Amino acid sequence: MNKIYSLKYSAATGGLIAVSELAKRVSGKTNRKLVATMLSLAVAGTVNAANIDISNVWARDYLDLAQNKGIFQPGATDVTITLKNGDKFSFHNLSIPDFSGAAASGAATAIGGSYSVTVAHNKKNPQAAETQVYAQSSYRVVDRRNSNDFEIQRLNKFVVETVGATPAETNPTTYSDALERYGIVTSDGSKKIIGFRAGSGGTSFINGESKISTNSAYSHDLLSASLFEVTQWDSYGMMIYKNDKTFRNLEIFGDSGSGAYLYDNKLEKWVLVGTTHGIASVNGDQLTWITKYNDKLVSELKDTYSHKINLNGNNVTIKNTDITLHQNNADTTGTQEKITKDKDIVFTNGGDVLFKDNLDFGSGGIIFDEGHEYNINGQGFTFKGAGIDIGKESIVNWNALYSSDDVLHKIGPGTLNVQKKQGANIKIGEGNVILNEEGTFNNIYLASGNGKVILNKDNSLGNDQYAGIFFTKRGGTLDLNGHNQTFTRIAATDDGTTITNSDTTKEAVLAINNEDSYIYHGNINGNIKLTHNINSQDKKTNAKLILDGSVNTKNDVEVSNASLTMQGHATEHAIFRSSANHCSLVFLCGTDWVTVLKETESSYNKKFNSDYKSNNQQTSFDQPDWKTGVFKFDTLHLNNADFSISRNANVEGNISANKSAITIGDKNVYIDNLAGKNITNNGFDFKQTISTNLSIGETKFTGGITAHNSQIAIGDQAVVTLNGATFLDNTPISIDKGAKVIAQNSMFTTKGIDISGELTMMGIPEQNSKTVTPGLHYAADGFRLSGGNANFIARNMASVTGNIYADDAATITLGQPETETPTISSAYQAWAETLLYGFDTAYRGAITAPKATVSMNNAIWHLNSQSSINRLETKDSMVRFTGDNGKFTTLTVNNLTIDDSAFVLRANLAQADQLVVNKSLSGKNNLLLVDFIEKNGNSNGLNIDLVSAPKGTAVDVFKATTRSIGFSDVTPVIEQKNDTDKATWTLIGYKSVANADAAKKATLLMSGGYKAFLAEVNNLNKRMGDLRDINGESGAWARIISGTGSAGGGFSDNYTHVQVGADNKHELDGLDLFTGVTMTYTDSHAGSDAFSGETKSVGAGLYASAMFESGAYIDLIGKYVHHDNEYTATFAGLGTRDYSSHSWYAGAEVGYRYHVTDSAWIEPQAELVYGAVSGKQFSWKDQGMNLTMKDKDFNPLIGRTGVDVGKSFSGKDWKVTARAGLGYQFDLFANGETVLRDASGEKRIKGEKDGRMLMNVGLNAEIRDNLRFGLEFEKSAFGKYNVDNAINANFRYSF
């Protein structure tokens, strides 16, 4: 308000108006009488010039709220602030209004288009509202209407920086109606009308009895907010409110015209209910009068400046002040109307508009309604005016020019499709603007966050360092639409800016090529590849691109010879004064009020460590509120580059680096001192001032890293989740104190890993599943733990290899309780068994950590070198001593606690691995196992110490047990004794016996050659039998056989056997002789609970069949088969073996077909097959013991006798022969011998003979004269190995 206002009744306005107490013929006494008369209120003298109460609220909170800064973002809910007494203040749980409609002076509020509202008496003070500034645009008042001091103003341009405040759509007549529409339930449970006001009057800060005067009014820096309660709804057409007693900002001179907002429960949004009129003091409380929003008055002014033209699909021509409407687009004289300058032309229902002259609409613009298409043609003529307003879902195809000496303002949610180069600047507040020409506009200004620029041609932006596009407060969107775009810098002032590519089929490259430090505050998303490449032979460390907004793309990011930083953004706050204090002479000007304010709040800032609240800086390195930047991409490619992730950044994506430095959790952060204010020069220039300092906050990275000749540093408060495979070649990595790295995928490094923080290595969790695949982790130079806070963890199906070194009291954790161990993915069960030995975690390496603590739970440690530990605690775990070249190993522990665990030590006849405990050994239910890597039968007389511990150690800490090693059960003989200085567990001998179960499993595996031979034998004679059934001729044939078999010991197999061949018929005296050749392929799979694998076989053979006229026949066949085998065994540590073998076959069958009738027969038969099966041998080590398993070459001889019966059925054009058979197959020779050898000796297992009953049924059919088809089912029974089911299908084509 202008100075201090009293209230006076006005006959002209029909209500109260505010009149300066300094005005002529008005006195405080006169005013008091008027107020007492009209309002029945007692006004106690003049109102004190006091407004912002900072006794319990920081000054900055009032300013942040009005300027929508800090936590007070539009729409924010559950907002609370901390008061200076430490209490919380919640604003009655109201959401935060959008105050962007407030002009910079605070004395007027935009309501959309070219209109704003204020109070009429502000006209006396041009600073208040005669010229209104929004962001970088200034607007002049060109006309007004007012009533009861409420004033609606028309501006010379459409306001692009804001869509404006939403006006109240209704004016309740009573308080109860208003309470229903605008009331909210307050924190005390009562329903009240609570609202906000934003203005910038003559600001003073009150702290108790002291006052800090700013001597400033209408300053945008000091735009502040009030929280109020409406106490009277209607008083001479106005409402009355009082300020909140805690968040207390009393209106003062200069606040006149500022907007008052209430939450509309029906619309569910904040609405502008009026403008601030005047103040009065009643019983010591200040009351504020709000002149209500006058929708009728607003509509009258808008109607005055609107010229509506219904095109209805037709066209109009505009020349000078004449507008001519042509019906049905006919180019004839039509209806003419006069255009009044400064009026808005409102087009409806679509159509064409043709300019036939240069048009200057003054403060008038062109408005297009919703949902239609318009074509604007200019024939080289220009338009100039307030701007263009396009309704929702309307398209305006702009083929005219805008005047180059003015700036086009575009608002409305519709689309402006610009088809011609304009040679002018544009400011965009809402909707889409499509650019179809190179350099369509000289410069583009985007504001409010509601506008979008769409590129529809290469180079459609400018060619300067900013590409001629500027994003002011809340910015807007640039859609590359499949076009590449290069910037030196993007002129964006906040995260309201978004650069996207909506073309899902064509990637757009966004290149940012700054060679000096630059911060981009906006967002990047869509189908975009981001690059920051500097053309240089050397790395340009000054070419630092800093992203503190967000990236969300499935494409790559590329950086070469430059630096890239991803970080959060220090939240901007209000400042008290942006300009410097121009008076440095304290004795003349007094102490600068900004300094006084800072000193006033210093004690509270010291208490709460909150100097940043009073330092007159919009951002500070020490402030706690940083916006988290989220950055998602596919792969970041670094070449001779630096990449850092600083505080409050969350990065997701893979990294591929070459000769680069990667820092995750970088302490160096960057602040743009002009953030939010970067855009200058009426909106078409950009300034940035960057400060850098140290500031630590949480940093996250999720992805995998591949790096060559690079370096990686993980800093304090960084959380790194390596869920992608990580391969580091000649790339050291360090993990600082306070950092956490979680490797959820395999990790390999040719260097070491330095750990001062925490490293966790795990298996690979499967997406959308609770199962886990084992993860492999390997560090060639080991893991180096530094300091007492270093933490090394391996769990959740992790297999880790690499020595561990710790120089202090670090913590090393291996495994986790069995109850927490996840399910292993079914596809990796066998692999997990090999890697983890049935434990949760496996570790291979030595641990040198004389001050550290190692904890093992459900883990196995393969100890392969000398190790020393301060404290070792194990549960449900195993420590297994291993080593190369027969070297024995010693584990030295100061304090050892073991429960339900096992120690496996190796021993020969003279030496052994040793466990040395210096201070304490305790525990129960533990096994002491011995791997005998050298034995010579039962042996006594050994004297080898395995464990030594302090004197008095309980004798039952360990117990010896029998171990299955190789094909033997070995039992160590261990003597426990307590000498004068120590307790020892000494190996004095061992006993070994054959392990029948291991031998059985080995024999079952080695019998695979015999079973493969048998499968081939069963299929040898199939072809010759077919020839007898079909009275065949010379021809070609094919057969496929699929079957399954089983044997004792859980053995089962399945196979698919394919035969192809051709034969020739020779008609001789008294017999038919068939000779032929065959090729075969067999794919078989076999397994048991002890092994599994497959055999692929290929073979070739010759056969002959002589069929005598008497019914007798003789079949002969010879065949060779080559086998490729791969089997994995789970016994005796055999693992997976690949080997080749072969076999020979020679078979003869004789029989006689006796015809019972012409179509039925009985056929007794006998077969003998002799063969050769190659042997095989495997040699390996199990737990240090040398093992050999082999079977020799052997020659099977297999006989078969049986009888077949059959009958033929025929018709005119068909014939089918059905048959059934029953036989017995038997071994004449025993199959091969298996030899097993381990350190306890040799075991020979003789082969056995087997026999089985064979059964089959089948048929052969003549499909055509020269085409035959056969099908047969068979199985066997009563053998040690049986064919459970087999099906045989064959085809023959006769020549």
From Swiss-Prot:
Primary gene name: sat
Enzyme kind, highest EC tier: hydrolase
PROSITE patterns for this protein: AUTOTRANSPORTER, PEPTIDASE_S6
Cell membrane is among the record's keywords: no
InterPro entries: Autotransporte_beta (IPR005546), Autotransporte_beta_dom_sf (IPR036709), Autotransporter_pectin_lyase_C (IPR012332), ESPR (IPR024973), OM_autotransptr_brl_dom (IPR006315), Pectin_lyase_fold/virulence (IPR011050), Peptidase_S6_dom (IPR030396)
Effect of residue 669 to A: In strain: Nissle 1917
Result, substituting residue 352 to N: In strain: Nissle 1917
Keyword list, A-Z: Cell outer membrane, Hydrolase, Membrane, Periplasm, Protease, Secreted, Serine protease, Signal, Transmembrane, Transmembrane beta strand, Virulence, Zymogen
Annotated protein name in UniProt: Serine protease sat autotransporter
NCBIfam families in the record: autotrans_barl
Peptidase S6 domain: residues covered: 51-300
Residues marked Cleavage (site): 1018-1019
Source species, domain of life: Bacteria
Activity control note: Inhibited by phenylmethylsulfonyl fluoride and Pefabloc.
Domain observations: The signal peptide, cleaved at the inner membrane, guides the autotransporter protein to the periplasmic space. Then, insertion of the C-terminal translocator domain in the outer membrane forms a hydrophilic pore for the translocation of the passenger domain to the bacterial cell surface, with subsequent cleavage.
Originating species: Escherichia coli O6:H1 (strain CFT073 / ATCC 700928 / UPEC)
